[in-house]
Structure formats: structure tokens, C-alpha cells
Amino acid sequence: MSVATLQRKLPEAAPRRAGQTELHPELNRAQVRFIGLGKTYQGQQGPVQALHDIDLSIQRGEVFGIIGRSGAGKSSLIRTINRLEQPSSGRVLIDQVDIGDFDEDRLVALRRRIGMIFQHFNLMSAKTVWHNVELPLKVAGVPKAERERKVRELLELVGLKDKHRAYPAQLSGGQKQRVGIARALVHDPEILLCDEATSALDPETTQSILGLLKEINQRLGLTIILITHEMAVIRDICDRVVVLEHGRIVEQGPVWEVFGNPQHEVSKTLLAPLQHGLPEELQNRLQSHPTSSDAALVLSLRFTGSSHEEPDLAALFGALGGRVRLLQGGVERIQGHALGQLLLAVQGSSLEAAQLRQRAGQWAQQVEVLGYVV
């Protein structure tokens, strides 16, 4: 078996109806589109609005991340894609078709085009790996020979071909999630929804699952839409990201752009664990003015990804003059862009603080003078 046997020609967008308005090229490529989407629940104390006027497009074949604090509306949003949640207002379009008025038969067909995996694996403990994956095909009335072929291919794809007789209790968390992924792929979906799919896994297992999702995305052309509270997951796998707060979009864009230079306070808070904060020991020593001739000026340099090249540290240090020490930081690449932060201590330079800041600005997109230390 080859993964190629699972590949298929992705359907074209629905044909344009007579008199239908020509769409912007970006929207023509959109596989999932939310237009003015709202969702209200009836709570004990009255109506609770989970989503407010969401306008968002997700392109075919991309890995799209949705982040936000608890209660921001993330799960409500993705569950409208397969109509597990019915919007209170607005529309959801898949391949430019409004799914709002689908009858039961069309909903069943839609849900087979959309796979879903969860934080909790939802496997049947009394069934083997093979039968857990096979069950949706059996329910759909797929002939036995076709079921066997499909299950065999999928277990090979997710790296579990030698575990087909095992029961869930005999599997690790990562292996259970691989079964969940295989089960989500049985109907050759075009879209895969991931709701906190790695939250219950250890870091090493998380990386292996992310590697599998990347492979599925690249080889099968699958659109992946994922929710996570782990910002490193978004950084490692997503093409674009949207930030929700109280059911509203507060920021969206390419991952490198949002991570490199977050604009909204919610984004900054969510991404703070990935940032290099000022060490407490250094913070306690910082002073606003130099107290001796050997005091060092502390600069914070941020690289927000607008350059594809890593900073030339030798040239930077030379331009600052004096003795330059790297206190903390690093630069990494996200989607080919250089992002990161450096904390530098500059001692004995003939340049004033404003001049040092200006010089450093030739390499870094954001430069801040933090103070002086001895």
C-alpha cells in the first residue's frame, strides 16, 4: 500500500449561479467561509452570546489555528462547520455552498466530508484498534472487502499496522490519538477538525502527532482546522491563526506575523509563555540611570519576522561599540521568517543611549532601552 492510494482529486468549487456576484480571488479559494456568524445559547441567567459577527475565510489545503482564552468561542466556531452547532445568525459556506438549509441527508453527506478528532480519544474499550477504525465504514454500509482495504491503509498511514489486534487499554495516549486520526479519515474527508487534539499528550508524543498531521496535510491535501491552548502547536504546524476573545475576532494573520508582532493585548498574553521575559535577578538590578562609570546599558531587541535573514550579530555588536554581552534570548525561524528577542548589555561604549538604540534598530525591528546594571 502507498499513501498515494488515499489521495484523491479535490473537488472544484461549486459552479457559480447565474447572476451571482463575482468573488474576490481570495474568497474564490476559500474552502470554509463564515459570514456575519453569531451563536447565542440560553443560559440559566438568560441568553449568552458565544459568537459575534464572525467574518473569516479558511483556504483549501491550509493548516489554520484558532486560539483564545477559555470561553472565547473556539469550539462553538468549529462545530458550526459540520453543523454540530446551529448558528443563531449569519452563514457558513463550504466550497461556496451555504450549509444552513441542508436537510438530514445532505448533513450526513457533509459530515462524511469533515473528519474530527478530540482531546479525549472516544475509543470503544471493548473493540480492537481495527474495529474502532472500521465501525464508521460498517455503519455507512461499505462492503467488507472495501472496509478491510481502507482500514489496512489507514493503520499503515498512522503507523499502527502492527497494533490492529490491540485494545485501547493496551495503547499509549499517542497511539490512541493515532487511532482517532485513522477513524476520522475513513470517509476520505476534505477537512479535518482538531479540538485540543494534543492537550492530553506529553511533549514528545505531541510532536509525533503534529508530524503525522503535517504529513496528512501535505500528502492528502487535507484542510486542517485546529483549536489548541498550546501556542507552540500553532507555531509548529499552522499557516495562519485567528485570535478570539469573547466570541469576537481580535486578530488574525500568518503565524509568523501574529507571533512576531502581536497587536492585541489578548494575543500578547497568550503568546507570553513563548517570549523571553526579563530574568527576575536582572530586573531587581535595573536602574533608570547609570550609577557608576562601569554601568552597562541593557537593550531589548525584538525581531518580528519582517526579515527572512537572521541578524548578523558580529556586525551588530561591532556597531554598538564597547563591550557587548548577550544576557538572554535567541532567534528562531517560523515560516521562513526570523523571529526572536535578544537582551544585550553594552558597557564602555562612546555612544549615548539614544544613539545605541538607533544603531541597534538597523538590525532589529523593535528596540527598547530597559535601564542600566552594574
From Swiss-Prot:
Binding site for ATP: 68-75
Enzyme Commission no: 7.4.2.11
UniProt keyword annotation of Signal present: no
GO cellular component, one term: plasma membrane
Location(s), subcellular: Cell inner membrane
Pfam families cross-referenced by the UniProt entry: ABC_tran (PF00005), NIL (PF09383)
Domain ABC transporter: 32-271
Alphabetic keyword roster: Amino-acid transport, ATP-binding, Cell inner membrane, Cell membrane, Membrane, Nucleotide-binding, Translocase, Transport
Record-annotated disulphide pairs: none
Coiled coil: none
Start and end residues of each stretch annotated as Disordered: 1-22
Top-level division of the source organism's lineage: Bacteria
Gene3D superfamilies recorded: 3.30.70.260, P-loop containing nucleotide triphosphate hydrolases (3.40.50.300)
GO molecular function annotations of the record: ABC-type D-methionine transporter activity; ATP binding; ATP hydrolysis activity
Secretion signal, residue range per the UniProt entry: none
Cross-referenced PROSITE patterns: ABC_TRANSPORTER_1, ABC_TRANSPORTER_2, METN
Catalytic activity: L-methionine(out) + ATP + H2O = L-methionine(in) + ADP + phosphate + H(+); D-methionine(out) + ATP + H2O = D-methionine(in) + ADP + phosphate + H(+)
EC class name: translocase
PANTHER family the record matches: AMINO ACID IMPORT ATP-BINDING PROTEIN (PTHR43166), METHIONINE IMPORT ATP-BINDING PROTEIN METN (PTHR43166:SF30)
Function recorded in the entry: Part of the ABC transporter complex MetNIQ involved in methionine import. Responsible for energy coupling to the transport system.
Family named by the database record: Belongs to the ABC transporter superfamily. Methionine importer (TC 3.A.1.24) family.
Name listed for the protein in its UniProt record: Methionine import ATP-binding protein MetN 2
